[in-house]
Amino acid sequence: MPLLTIDHVTVAFGNGPRKLVAVDDVSLTVERGEFLCLLGPSGCGKSTLLKVVSGLLAAHSGRVTLDTQERRDGLESVMVWQEPTLIPWRRIDDNVALSLELRGVPRAERRERAVEALKLLGIADFAAYFPRQLSGGMRQRAGIARALVADPRILLMDEPFAAVDAQTRRILQEQVLMLTQDLHKTVIFVTHSIEEALLLGDRIAVMSARPGRIKALIEVEFPRPRDPHIVRTARFQDLEEHIWDLLRGEAARAELET
């Protein structure tokens, strides 16, 4: 039985002639431990769908169920955004431990758990720093550590590497690849990058231009644990070209609508 089921979800904004359908009749399932990537052109509803899964946004119709129970809040999922939204006056370890603090976990224990999560991301030496003292990539690592400390059943990631430089992006991709494999996390990951989706995902849901629909579901056949060097293989490049063939027309249509 799937961990998460998205059942005929439609999201619309406004009414009458100004009504805008962002997501149209989307159905998906996500298995336990699966890494599902949502891939599509700008404005196709990827982030909107993720917000519905998180409980931050209500669907116009359809429903989202977790273990057959309808989702009514975001308590069993945690979102990692493009910007990590760290609280500027809190130390990094206190930012990471925020969810534990809200649960009433004692201070010493939550700091210990925060430092352990920061170790996984390679920035434990910066636990006592403040967000303004860290680079963008390090702040994003702290945001990922904060999500891991919360130990959600589903980790939702909305283009988390879009705001960092190319070298940092590659490092973060490799870290997330290793961590999600080692921790057996269930992940829904939004991206514009075909390469990123193929590197990280078990499946890729290719979305159409607005209104966003599922155009294709691609099984990513590369075994796990996955080596980042698969990007250099002929099979990877063939899949990348196949997905671009699916997306080319959608990207052009999205560009005309902006």
Language-model segments: residues:
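Short coil-to-helix segment of the ABC ATPase nucleotide-binding domain corresponding to the Q-loop/switch region
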Residues: 90-98
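Hydrophobic anchor residue at the start of the ABC signature
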Residues: 144
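Conserved signature/switch motifs of ABC ATPase nucleotide-binding domains
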Residues: 129-132, 150
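Conserved ABC transporter NBD signature motif
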Residues: 62-73
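The feature captures the beta-strand-to-loop junction immediately N-terminal to the Walker
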Residues: 39-41
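Helix-to-loop junction immediately C-terminal to a conserved catalytic motif
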Residues: 54
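A short, flexible loop at the N-terminus of ABC-type nucleotide-binding domains that lies
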Residues: 1-3, 12-25
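Conserved ABC ATPase "signature" region
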Residues: 101, 108-126, 178
